[in-house]
Amino acid sequence: MPLLSRRCFFSSAGILFAPPLNPTLFSSDSPTNEKVAAVRPLPMSTIFKGEDRFHAIVKKASEENWRELPIGERIIKCARELHGLPYENFTLEIDDHIESPSVNLEGLDCWTFFEQAMGLARMISIEKEKYTPEDLLREIEFTRYRGGVCTGNYLERIHYLAEWFFENEARGTCRHLTPELTGAERIHDRRISEMTVLWKSYRYLKNNPELREPMAEWEARVAAMPVYHIPKAKVPALEPQLQNGDVIGIATKHHGGFCSHVGLAIRTDDGVTRFMHASRNYRKVVIDKSVSGYLNQFSSHAGILVGRPLEVSETV
């Protein structure tokens, strides 16, 4: 399983040493706040695919009253509606120049799988007479971009998974559990370079060379970040503490990034806490082995990072 590829193998890192977040952006429980919603510079046909599936999920959620479920259970309900969808590479590279929030419910990579399941779950927690694709795009914008806002700049997007954990904890959408879990260990001396080394694989970096130097500066911040993981050998003892809908980052032993993959924890009827993810190997979204069993399939896997999504009413 190669590391340095956007094929769902996302270098994970944080932005602790980045400029401070603007607290005025986080004064609402929901990205329906006007300060969060952005004008969409690209056509809806480019930024939103799978509208029929979107409406089918919304209809089912309404009929079965998913809104009353805890956020983790709601995420898994949404994730199950994505089960079996095809794996697709580079789903976020939708334009040569303009960055925009986007949704693709026809094909998913590992990042967009967990992100869209969480976005749908957050969206339906806010009671509305009718949901539109724009509602989901706002949720995606709120969690995908630094400060919860995209103005069209590629560098606004969170490109490394642990950055997502730290950014979203600051915003109150996800609790970053990893550092406080028993057995957590810091990953030291990690080179972060996936985006700049593989710039030819990314439409925006390939077509806008002026972005590469500032991307390298972000990677330098990322490399200095105190990122913790739960080592592989300690994960079996941790599995009973994992909850449905927890975001599970797969820590890697290789340089280039902190993580190589991401998915969701799901407890199945047999009582096993499994790893649900958009799989390159299976070419679709699958409910896989136990989290520890999945880790043990690959010698490059070092362990896991864990984030627990929070209810919309719990955001700051």
Predicted feature descriptions by range:
Residues 88-220, 277:
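Acidic/His-rich structured neighborhood in mature extracellular/periplasmic domains
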Residues 23-56:
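C-terminal segment of N-terminal export signals and the immediately downstream linker at the start
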